[in-house]
Amino acid sequence: MTAVGAAVVRVGRLVWEAGAAVGPLLGNGDAVGVLGRWLDGADAGRAEDALLASYHLYDEDLLALVPAIARWVGVESAAAHVRRLLGMVPVRRLRPVLVPVLAARLREEPDPDGPLHRACTGLLERLGLEDEVRRLTDPDSHGTRTPPPETPGEPGDGGAGPADGAPGGGEPADGKAGSADDEGAIEQAVRRSAHFMRRAAAAAAPLAGDPDAVALIDEWLSTWSGEHDLDSLRAAYMLPDDDLLALVPAIVRWVDVDRVAPHPRRLLCMLPISRLRPVLVPAVFSWLREDLEFDDLSWWSYADLLDDIGLNDEVRRIADLALTHEDRLVRAMGKEIVEDFLQD
């Protein structure tokens, strides 16, 4: 194996170690509470630990942490993690949680051209939510049915923030105080996960911008040997956007493969939508037409991916193709795609 190949494998294994460290915490409301408090506190090191560990959470847990993560929008040292973690949340579910939180924060900044406003606007544009930018400064945009959330302070300033009353902060989600031993175990797991993520980032640093690394990962993802696919996908979390974007066509091939889930979907969702869309959409439809062995569930998987990103027109295209497919099972799945994603 080449030196580049060995480095990719090492990065992938370190990311696996990071995920294994928090594996017992997945779906654990107490763990979400600890992460939320760390993100809400003044300790930047703890907050970074929480952000790094959050890459391995279930979607539900990550969604519960959105208000706490959003408190770090505009903090440059956390910017890359904030953008990518929020991108991993399906946009249909992210929108109603994130936008009011950002709007509440901006009510504290009178300057419409200030750095926080620019950071919030840039984040929404990256997520494909540019239609929501107006709501950030429009006091009437919340509507009359749902009041805006309480204004959070900056992380650690003691202001009333999401962690005071929302999932991800305060008491554990079930309302019961966890034992000190349980909380200590959670904190240890989070720190261990963050430790491995930092090691992975350090090991991946020489690979960033290296065309040989991108070419090798692309080659490994273009085969079905099963030897290096998971290492490649895990290592890709540590690549910069430009390198990850170059791998989109190769990653697309794995979207409907259960044994590597959820890595393909999450990697694609981490990218800025304006750059992702012109690469992703042709790759998806080319792959759907190319692979004659796709079953009906594969069609649903790709529709689900595009729905997660917010590409409704492309979901409609998949449904239309499925509805006219020669396979009756695929045609039936086309109807399910319409019912699941396009009814509202």
Regions found by a protein language model. Name each.
Residues 3-14, 104-106, 186-193:
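Disulfide-bonded cysteine-rich modules in secreted/extracellular proteins
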